[in-house]
Amino acid sequence: MLYSPLYQSIRLILFGALGLSSLTVSAAINQTDSMMPEPLVTDSSNQYADDESIQESLKRLAEFYERTPDTNVATSNNTGTNVSDEQSNIQNSLTPVTTNIPTVGSNLRLLPHTVDSAARCEGQWVYPKKNPNYQRAVNEAGASNGQPAPNLNGLPNNQAPLFAESDYGYYDNVDYAELSGNVIIDQGTQHIEAEKIVLDLSNGVAAAQGKVMFTDQATGNASATQTQDRVQKNGKTSLTDKAAQGGLIGVADNLNYNTETGQSTATNVAFASVELQAHGYAKRLNRPNESQYELDEVMYSTCPPTNRKWQFDAKSIDLDTETGRGEAYNTTFRIADVPVFYLPYFNFPIDSRRGSGFLLPNASISSENGLEVDVPYYFNLAPNYDATLSTHIYTTRNPMLSGEFRYLTENYGEGIFNGSYLPNDKEYDGEDRRSLFYDHYWSSTSIPRLSGEAKYSHVSDADYLNDFDTLGLSDNTLNLARRAQLNYYNDYVDGELKVETFQTLDALNNNGQMLQDKDKPYSRLPQLNLDYRLPWAKNFDITGVSDSAYFKKSIDDGSENEKSGTRFYNKLSASYPMENSWGYIKPKLSLQHLFTSYDKDSLVDNSLDKDDGNQSVFVPQASIDAGLHFYQAGSPFGAFDDTLGGYRLLSPRLKYTYSPFKDQNNIPNFNTRIASINYEQLFSDSWFLGHDRLQDLHAFTPGINYRYIDATGVTRFDGSIAEQFYIDDGGVTLDNTKPVFTSSSSGLVWDTSTQPYNNVWVDVSGALTNSYDLNYITTELRYQPSDNSLFNVGFIKRQRDENTNQLPLSALTASAVFPINNNWRVLAQGQYDYNRNQMLDSLIGIDYEDCCFGFAVYGRRYYNDLNIADKPTQAIMAEVRLSGLGSGSSRLTRLLADKVLGFEPVQSAWKD
């Protein structure tokens, strides 16, 4: 029984203690997550560990560390295991799987088939058992009042009933009360134990004394069901969210609270977070007022208490919830009892509010830059704009300064500036190196579906991107865009108005010669594109395309005569689609018009008068596209009817296209090229990509698609094959060269995708010439023996194609990500050109993941895409990760996600 005059005061003790300790954990996490310098290595003990009081608190806290690596249940009374297994069985019974078709290699046992991240730890932090007397007392209180007992699940703690029990209780009916002997207080999900609790209102003092223990299960007991659901859904929760959810266990020697000033103090506090699986301690924890906290002799780690491999120690930490900032003094990062990093002072955030301060530093080694260390500093200038200034220190170059500025406006969009400057680069003949990039995005608040963007890019030289991107994460773009653009769309029109020019970097063309002015792209000053449809006819589809632009390209090196001017292209089409479940037929008529006009400089350069500089041409086009759909239940040849089941779809298709020849040799080519051959291209209306040429095409294209879908909806086979046959030779050329389409056919084209087993995928596509020699072939084999391993092998071979500027290539690609055991894995990726006998790109690394830390060491060797004749860049990188700190994303994972098909789910399985 709790006397009513004690209710509010004991609540203050409980909330003062728990709120203080919870904030301590949250502060440590936020500090390291967003503002701590990146740790290099880590440790387990510190200068305060010899303190007997601290050791006693840690020893008491360790009672809640359960050495049960096989369990997924974060509670000491593990009654939910059977529930978890039962739910897992139910889930498996509801999930359709093709159990009769085995996974390849399922019985080989060459690699671990599962990686259990929980087994990497010796145990886990668990909540103490709930006090059964609390719920019983709540039920009895409700019954005595003739009311049902309140449902405690989801009820805010400040609204939940307060329950207290002890061996002895005294109250003088005025201002003094005392509970002693096995004192227990419960309210909602919060629980406190002590040997004695004293309340003296005359002196304004409340205290909990002797073996104080408190818990805050604000997220509720982590039952087996909740844990299993989180695993099945691969759910991810941010560190800040986890800290805010509670899940705290704490022990202390005593707690003191001043009821008049609100000041509270705890000594020899040890705490653990169940959600974060982290723990720590503070020699003294003081709250002078409701918004300020002072911690002395602080430790924090996510390692097991029995084997603390790393930890952060601080002489003192001051937290201010009003400003959202914290200050740490004399902080040491330790690994295996060895201090490896020290900061005398740093300022960090304790909530989601931004604040100025140092960010995580980076370090790398490469053949271009030697050792590079980057130290960024963040400026929180205003709620809607900020900046980051970084200093880059190189062993082989002078220091470089780079900066980033971000802004967000209410009505004018958002943008970001990035720039850098390196004076007198010793590795680049003493030249200054610099860059500037700008991106802006805007959406209208007054006109729906109207948006805009602006982009600017500049680098000082062609080698800049390659030299200052250690692992080659940025695209080595030949033409850096500078663009301003407006976009609008609705149900009937999709429009784009833009002005665009480029900075073209020095590079080699396909013949190994330096690019000339004639090889550079045209600027569009401006260009207007419209795609529209007319809603007039009920059964007809009437659509149009309009592309108008002024193209400009100055020729200063005499590589060719200048050919700049305006181009107007329009196409109006009418089709009458007839569709049914068994097939379709789509006749279509189109009329195209192309008008070009040279500007004054081009007229002079080409010795043309104004009339000769204007060209206009009309080309009509007619086409019929028809197809059938045949459906049949069962598997191919009945081979899998008893196992996979499913159905088959056979879809033959035939398209006929006719457009007459119109001479266009005097029309300039601003940005048009011939499309690469593939299955879908055979059914398009033109082989020209761009609107400078109107193709004369008289051809028919037969094709067929076959699909097999099993009973679970998995497409086991999807294959297509087609060939375009030319009735008349094509006469339109790109650049006054010989006609392109003068053969009898395009050659055979195919595209197939197969999944013969649940963990094997095979993709093959290719094309033959009209004489049935090989044009190109690409294959990709993906094998995933387990959730955390992946093997890819690919092959590509293509012949030179003068029409499409396709270069010959014979290359092998391969990648592998696989665990050696529960802690170690190998990552590798490569691309080999066996015509040149040259490894174009290779990466190999090892990755280690432990209970509370991980690291990776990897190297990459790759060639500059802009100049394959250059020497390859070689880089070695090392990463250290501390569990529970940081986002988990790294340069290595970003690189592999781009290079390795299917890497991201494998990465999630390894981490989770």
Swiss-Prot record:
Gene Ontology terms: biological process: Gram-negative-bacterium-type cell outer membrane assembly; lipopolysaccharide transport
Single GO cellular component term: cell outer membrane
Gene3D superfamilies xref list: Lipopolysaccharide (LPS) transport protein A like domain
Keyword Phosphoprotein among UniProt keywords: no
One Pfam family in the UniProt entry: LptD
Keywords: Cell outer membrane, Membrane, Signal
Signal peptide: 1-27
Disulfide bond positions: none
Protein's cellular compartments: Cell outer membrane
Oligomeric and partner information: Component of the lipopolysaccharide transport and assembly complex. Interacts with LptE and LptA.
Function: Together with LptE, is involved in the assembly of lipopolysaccharide (LPS) at the surface of the outer membrane.
Family: Belongs to the LptD family.
Protein name: LPS-assembly protein LptD
Organism expressing this protein natively: Psychrobacter arcticus (strain DSM 17307 / VKM B-2377 / 273-4)
Upper lineage: Bacteria, Pseudomonadati, Pseudomonadota, Gammaproteobacteria, Moraxellales
